[in-house]
Every structure is written in C-alpha cells, then in structure tokens.
Regions:
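Basic nucleic-acid-binding interfaces
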Residues: 1-75
Length: 75
C-alpha cells in the first residue's frame, strides 16, 4: 500500500523543489513560481504558516513531474 502524502509547510515543499533542481523565478503576492532548467514549472502558495493540503501537494508534484517517492526521498 502506498504511503499517504503528508501535509507540509510551503517552506518544506520549496526546499524539496530546490533539491531536485527547481529555482524560484518570480513571486506574485503569496505565490512563488518555480522553474526547472528543462522547462518544467509549478506554483507554490505561501500563506503564512498554513499547511499545503494533500490535494494541492499532489497537483504540485504532477506539474513538476516528481513522483511521491522522489519527493519523500528529498524531504
């Protein structure tokens, strides 16, 4: 059975994205746009100290083309 994706703070998600090669390109309000050198992109909301829900985290992983296993390894 697959492990559930945890609810995390935005800073943890951004740390993993940087670890797999993404860089913050710009920010609009509380949303940070990340881009990988190969062209993949995703957007991470940063709203105070709130957790990023599982559904949104799944969407970020899908956009970034990162598997949940790869994400967990870089946590």
């Amino acid at each position: 059975m697959a492990k559930r994706i945890p609810m995390l703070k935005a800073r943890d998600v951004m740390r993993v994205l940087r670890a797999v090669g993404f860089a913050a390109k710009r920010q609009s309000g509380s949303h940070i746009f990340f881009q990988h050198p190969d062209g993949r992109t995703t957007l991470v909301p940063r709203h105070g100290g709130e957790d990023i829900g599982r559904g949104l985290l799944r969407q970020i992983l899908r956009e970034a083309e990162i598997t949940p296993e790869e994400f967990s390894e870089n946590l």
